[in-house]
Amino acid sequence: MHTFFIAPTGFGVGLTSISLGLLRALERAGLKVGFFKPIAQLHPGDLGPERSSELVARTHGLDTPKPLPLAQVERMLGDGQLDELLEEIISLYQRAAADKDVVIVEGMVPTRHASYAARVNFHLAKSLDAEVILVSAPENETLTELTDRIEIQAQLFGGPRDPKVLGVILNKVRGEADAANAEDGVADFARRLTEHSPLLRDDFRLIGCIPWQDELNAARTRDIADLLSARVINAGDYEQRRVQKIVLCARAVPNTVQLLKPGVLVVTPGDRDDIILAASLAAMNGVPLAGLLLCSDFPPDPRIMELCRGALQGGLPVLSVATGSYDTATNLNRMNKEIPVDDRERAERVTEFVAGHIDFEWLKQRCGTPRELRLSPPAFRYQVVQRAQKAGKRIVLPEGSEPRTVQAAAICQARGIARCVLLAKPEEVQAVAQAQGIVLPEGLEIIDPDLVRQRYVEPMVELRKGKGLNAPMAEQQLEDSVVLATMMLALDEVDGLVSGAIHTTASTIRPALQLIKTAPGYNLVSSVFFMLLPDQVLVYGDCAVNPDPSASDLAEIAVQSAASAQAFGIPARVAMISYSTGDSGSGVDVDKVREATRLAREQRPDLLIDGPLQYDAAAIASVGRQKAPNSPVAGQATVFIFPDLNTGNTTYKAVQRSADCVSVGPMLQGLRKPVNDLSRGALVEDIVYTIALTAIQADAQAPA
């Protein structure tokens, strides 16, 4: 599926018109299209509905999600809730994209009150993994100045050489004055721009060049009445007639006659009987004036209106306002040029006109090109929460009175991410909640370990009888809440376990290895971090468990990590990381990675696995082409397997801090049932996502 993000280069470029035309062009190509306007930008005094979504619904019959109100967006941005905002937008986008081949996403328009629009558009395009089409309108500028302005905007999204930045559509283009007609003038403009602009190459192209058409901007006479809150003396055809030109008449009739042409709105004081009569005579002679607008609060003489009856019955609209000529003209100048949501005729004409000036063959070819979607960080977080909510699993938290854990459990319970079980004394949990201002939602389970501990003694002895465990020893070990929670998991009373906010990694994993054991086909437990980089999610393993894995261990970690990536919608291209690429180096460490690569390929010949690869060769396309030109993984790796814990843990923390990215994990792999360890510095958000990951693992491991 393709997602096209339509981004304006400035104010007044006609963004909605371009969206309408693109949708029509895509429909002509036989594609199932969707439309999404993430954020509503209503003009002052505009009470809605949001214009773009409503026009798309009326012209294309699409059910579009309701955009977020601008006030809500500004509040979330002001509160530093950009991630939450993007997740909410992705939730709406999923509705628009359901069962579609291509989705048009319309970005924000920069205005005096929304100077942050460009930054928001950047984050929206990245989060939706969208291909960007810029929309610009030439102003009074040279071709060089126009090109520079477009390139500056393209740089916001990665530059014109970024494969996701497709090109530009120029709207409202006025051709050369000496051209035979407007179409020829615009064609000549497009040719000169393409020939002389270094910006417009094959990888950044001119996708469309839309000529300026006065008639497409013509408002209905009724729209003028609404704008001015005018009194309607005679409605006539004011729903159908369009204002092509406004003429302020203060001169004598002989000097006015030549101005009375089709589509003209005549503005004159209400006591200018001569102008009123002249306009009426013109109308009765077949000139379809847009209407008469009488100003200065002078009501027309009834006798004059009686003389004009033929014109009025013929459909001539007559409006009246209290303001004088100057103020009326000023108010008319403030007319919003956008298409009203109920003007279906104008919307259809604009849609067809724009669609006819889009490079249809290129658009069809682009949509027919398969494209691997990258999972952006907000999309990953959204997906994790959605899948956890759908799983509905019961997750035990043995550190039940730890403040961060209590808050995370409350969030997960309230959002339906998991059915959380806090293992702690109820009065301690209540005290923490009161001190932290946490509202404990209904249904949040709190189990006092002292009241249930005894019933796990016998089952634990049975599980560990081969290791010489007796009842007194079991009772002593069950004093540890992590051991008690692990027994609950072993007996299938819960679906997963999350611990580590105050316990060490060993304290979390050891009971799991003793009581849960490894999953069939696995000999060890490892871990991965999901690294939420700005434009994609990568998987790092192992960064938390195995200090110095052997070649066979490393191969197993690679296979486990690839499976984890695929389980969360990330295509698995596995890079076995070393200080050397290919055959360029030798030594014990690089030989271990080389052997691990061979073993992993033997175990899973269906996976893309390559190594040894240096990190830059694995991650950066240009370096990968130079250092490992024949590698199926180099430059596009999604799963990074580090040779030891020292390298893995150092790298994950360095990337996390230097790239200022969120990491989710560690998520443990290889256990028969999901147990996950937290960093002791984990934030509440980290715990929430770890609980969600655990719920998804439990769902994946559940018997069919």
Swiss-Prot record:
InterPro entries: DRTGG, P-Actrans_bac, P-loop_NTPase, P_AcTrfase, P_AcTrfase_dom1, P_AcTrfase_dom2, Phos_Acetyltrans/Butyryltrans, PTA_PTB
Top-rank taxon, per record: Bacteria
A cellular-component GO term for this protein: cytoplasm
UniProt catalytic activity: acetyl-CoA + phosphate = acetyl phosphate + CoA
Gene3D superfamilies assigned to the protein according to its UniProt record, in alphabetical order: 3.40.50.10950, HprK N-terminal domain-like, Isocitrate/Isopropylmalate dehydrogenase-like, P-loop containing nucleotide triphosphate hydrolases
GO BP: acetyl-CoA biosynthetic process
Cytoplasm in keyword set: yes
Pathway(s) of this molecule: Metabolic intermediate biosynthesis; acetyl-CoA biosynthesis; acetyl-CoA from acetate: step 2/2
Traits of the deletion mutant: Decreased survival under anaerobic conditions.
Keyword annotations: Acyltransferase, Cytoplasm, Transferase
Family, as annotated: In the N-terminal section; belongs to the CobB/CobQ family. In the C-terminal section; belongs to the phosphate acetyltransferase and butyryltransferase family.
Protein purpose: Involved in acetate metabolism. In combination with LdhA and AckA, allows fermentation of pyruvate, enhancing long-term survival under anaerobic conditions.
NCBIfam families named among the record's database cross-references: PRK05632.1, PRK09653.1, pta
Free-text comment about domains: The N-terminal region seems to be important for proper quaternary structure. The C-terminal region contains the substrate-binding site.
Name this protein carries in UniProt: Phosphate acetyltransferase
Organism: Pseudomonas aeruginosa (strain ATCC 15692 / DSM 22644 / CIP 104116 / JCM 14847 / LMG 12228 / 1C / PRS 101 / PAO1)
Gene name tied to this protein: pta
